[in-house]
UniProtKB/Swiss-Prot annotation:
UniProt xrefs under InterPro entries: Carotenoid_Oase
Phenotype for H58A: No significant effect on beta-carotene 15,15'-monooxygenase activity. Decreased catalytic efficiency
Entry's localization field: Cytoplasm, Cytosol
Gene assigned in the entry: Bco1
Native species: Mus musculus
Pathway: Cofactor metabolism; retinol metabolism
Enzyme class of the recorded protein, top EC level: oxidoreductase
Cofactor requirements of the protein: Fe(2+)
Name assigned to this protein: Beta,beta-carotene 15,15'-dioxygenase
GO-annotated biological processes: beta-carotene metabolic process; carotene catabolic process; retinal metabolic process; retinoid metabolic process; retinol metabolic process
Role this protein plays: Symmetrically cleaves beta-carotene into two molecules of retinal using a dioxygenase mechanism.
Length: 566
């Protein structure tokens, strides 16, 4: 078995044509753009955690039945500094980098001081975000990197802190029908408060305000929620939205800010400053988008760890939301590279299997309701919300399915009643070996698998003009533990889950995390421009001859959604 995790991957800078078997639907024209860690060793130094690896972008351009593949490392400041030094010099969440041992004591002391309030990495390895006419590689720090989706060139570095007060931000924003972006971040001890900030980025900017600036630079705070702890805010990877509400889980998987501030001096990583409190609760915050204020009732559930929200919607006076939940934080621990050896598949076991859980939260609590009564009147779920003596509401979920991760949906149904979830099947081992279609209504599933194959997150692309929720295709980049088998792009019929085609690539492809599909409806005569604040090298780099230019119509793309780096 070939080791998949932790290997350095080679870039495929020029497009290489894939070998297509089967038949690609004629309507499927566009680019699948994905992101994930691709380099874990720099010189003699190694990252500790798989999620620390340097970002490697890759794309599949699908046109007229042909597929072209290319990949390129994100030219972040982190990447450039590491490569120039031929060692890891910028800290990641699971790996602390240290000053040159040849520096004198005064230089070392200054380094310790500067790391007390760390300037986080711009190694944006988790997802791709569409914002107006621009595309950005994203991570969970305050930095995002603008990229050219055709050439995979790295453009502008953007610091969220210049526009909204956040030190951390999710890589799983939401998009409304107009193309506006809604995201969340954490503001640490800002003016004496630690808070969770929901912010909005407009899809377009009025000409009077544009002045060459991207919509990100017109981001504004939508609302904020005070953290229950000033110095131990909750870690979160995603959030949910309905047509009228935002769903945020303040879970007992926490960041210890004091420990993070002293991590560099103590010689430990920032990841070691996270802890899961089994004795605490998970608090459910429901924010009304119309008033920009939280619903006043206190909702909570048992302690759990959630990385990915699946979807949320309103029904019969309740907010229903679906998440992938764990009983503990063991998933993150398993992805330390020391654990990712040849015995990984056989010996690595989660202490908690990921479960698909549905919660129902009543929007209006009857003050006269009896203590202990179930406030949920929705017939479609067995989830409960029990009124307590102090007026708080204890929510217990309906468990829909056990053993899945990396969930995706038909994004046209985001925030609305829906039926289908597409995900990677994950049992007690965190290795994804199957792609799953789960039918919430019938509680049935369809699966795809192939020996020695590890699928990436399955992404749904709808058939143009589709009326059925599952009318479309599933795209997944597949890598193999068999060195004799080429990696390939898998295309499934989303209804039947049968294989339509695959495009095998003779290239060094990595196991990625998240991304999006850009239909050719978005490609036109407007070229992505370099940043106004920095000069982009290689501006005369030739574009992919298989791709037209980009015009960025607002809604004709399939977005990453709310979903550490999973």
């Amino acid at each position: 078995m070939e080791i998949i995790f932790g290997q350095n991957k080679k870039e495929q800078l020029e497009p290489v044509q894939a070998k297509v078997t089967g038949s690609i639907p004629a309507w499927l024209q566009g680019t699948l753009l994905r992101n994930g860690p691709g380099m874990h060793t720099v010189g003699e130094s190694k990252y500790n955690h798989w999620f620390d690896g340097l970002a490697l972008l890759h794309s599949f351009s699908i046109r007229d039945g042909e597929v072209f593949y290319r990949s390129k490392y994100l030219q972040s400041d982190t990447y450039i500094a590491n490569i120039e030094a031929n060692r890891i010099v910028v800290s990641e969440f699971g790996t602390m980098a240290y000053p040159d041992p040849c520096k004198n004591i005064f230089s070392k002391a200054f380094s310790y001081l500067s790391h007390t309030i760390p300037d986080f990495t711009d190694n944006c390895l988790i997802n791709i975000m569409k914002c107006g006419e621009d595309f950005y590689a994203t991570t969970e720090t305050n930095y995002i990197r603008k990229i050219d989706p055709q050439t995979l060139e790295t453009l502008e570095k953007v610091d969220y802190r210049k526009y909204v007060a956040v030190n951390l931000a999710t890589s799983h924003p939401h998009y409304d029908e107009a193309g506006n972006v809604l995201n969340m971040g954490t503001s640490v001890v800002d003016k004496g408060r630690t808070k969770y900030v929901i912010f909005k980025i407009p899809a377009t900017v009025p000409d009077s305000k544009k002045k060459g600036k991207s919509p990100v630079k017109h981001a504004e705070v939508f609302c904020s929620i005070s953290s229950r702890s000033l110095l131990s805010p909750s870690y979160y990877h995603s959030f949910g939205v309905t047509e009228n509400y935002v769903v945020f889980l303040e879970q007992p998987f926490k960041l210890d800010i004091l420990k993070m501030a002293t991590a560099y001096m103590r010689g430990v990583s920032w990841a070691s400053c996270m802890s899961f409190d089994r004795e605490d609760k998970t608090y459910i915050h429901i924010i009304d988008q119309r008033t920009r204020k939280p619903v006043p009732t206190k909702f909570y559930t048992d302690p759990m760890v959630v990385f990915h929200h699946v979807n949320a919607y309103e029904e019969d006076g309740c907010v229903l939301f679906d998440v992938i939940a764990y009983e503990d934080s063991s998933l993150y621990q398993l992805f330390y590279l020391a654990n990712l050896n040849k015995d990984f598949e056989e010996k690595s076991r989660l202490t908690s299997v990921p479960t698909l859980r549905r919660f129902a939260v009543p929007l209006h609590v009857d003050k006269d309701a009896e203590v202990g009564s179930n406030l949920v009147k929705v017939s479609s779920t067995t989830a409960t919300a029990l009124k307590e003596k102090d007026g708080h509401v204890y929510c217990q979920p309906e468990v829909l399915y056990e053993g899945l991760e990396l969930p995706r949906i038909n994004y046209a149904y985001n925030g609305k009643p829906y039926r289908y979830i597409f995900a990677a099947e994950v049992q007690w081992s965190p290795v994804p070996t199957k792609i799953l279609k789960y039918d919430i209504l019938t509680k049935s599933s369809l699966k795809w698998s192939e020996e020695s194959c590890w699928p990436a997150e399955p992404l749904f692309v709808p058939t143009p003009g589709a009326k059925d929720e599952d009318d479309g295709v599933i795209l997944s980049a597949i890598v193999s533990t068999d060195p004799q088998k080429l990696p390939f792009l898998l295309i499934l019929d989303a209804k039947s889950f049968t294989e339509l085609a695959r495009a095998s690539v003779d290239a060094d492809m990595h196991l990625d995390l998240h991304g999006l599909f850009i239909p050719d409806a978005d490609w036109n005569a407007v070229k992505q421009t370099p940043a106004e604040t920095q000069e982009v090298e290689n501006s005369d780099h030739p574009t992919d001859p298989t791709a037209p230019e980009l015009s960025h119509s607002e809604n004709d793309f399939t977005a990453g959604h709310g979903g550490s780096s999973l």
